[in-house]
Amino acid sequence: MIKKRIIPCLDVKDGRVVKGIQFKGLRDIGNPVDLAIYYNEAGADELVFLDISKTEEGHSLMLEVIEQTASRLFIPLTVGGGIQSLDDITQLLNHGADKVSLNSSALKNPQLIKQASDKFGRQCICIAIDSYYDPERKAHYCCTHGGKKMTNIKVYDWVQQVEQLGAGELLVTSMGHDGMKQGFDIEHLAKIKSLVNIPIIASGGGGNAQHFVELFNQTDVSAGLAASILHDRETTVQSIKEVIRQGGIAVR
């Protein structure tokens, strides 16, 4: 039995960790290196850094953050945000990232997934999907630019395409659930998992440990992402894991 993972997510803007609700209203959380070390020691299975900086200076700061963090971590580090090319991926991996997460650039140029997978191995390539449910069209669509722009690409079509192109993992954020702490989008995540064979990290809505139990009981996703509840110290990684174990679910 593959053990489930709990993964803290740190949105980094201009060298600081920030958090919003439904991708809006960002507030400062703290120093990314300090937080990464804290989560490493607190029992996190992996870490995700998403660089949401708008400037080149911000992206350069991110490389420093990755280098300082990676040398002190004993768990895998995935980095996403602003990645446009194979050179960008090379730079991130050389600075200490274990995996990279592609989003807008992959939607713009799907062949980047294949090129990256061929060059670095599919185990390094995670595709992040910001999924928005459009009630008028009654379908989930992929969004780009940090959730600000909706495309005409349907999520259920896209997940199958990226798997064929060589993605090794999916990071699916349900935008309507992000930061709301009301539970994961179970039905949506279960549908995606039925369409692909690669691991899925679920993001958006984890408000308490029971939400993670429901996630793992009702879907076959591999991991749950947590941000708000951990950053605000409402709970800890170990507390979440303990409740998951009590629910009879194998967790790392």
From Swiss-Prot:
It catalyses: 5-[(5-phospho-1-deoxy-D-ribulos-1-ylimino)methylamino]-1-(5-phospho-beta-D-ribosyl)imidazole-4-carboxamide + L-glutamine = D-erythro-1-(imidazol-4-yl)glycerol 3-phosphate + 5-amino-1-(5-phospho-beta-D-ribosyl)imidazole-4-carboxamide + L-glutamate + H(+). Pfam families: His_biosynth. It is found in: Cytoplasm. GO terms for biological process: L-histidine biosynthetic process. InterPro entries: Aldolase_TIM, His_biosynth, HisF, IGPS_HisA/HisF, RibuloseP-bd_barrel. The keyword Methyltransferase does not apply. Belongs to the HisA/HisF family. This is Imidazole glycerol phosphate synthase subunit HisF. It comes from Staphylococcus aureus (strain JH9).
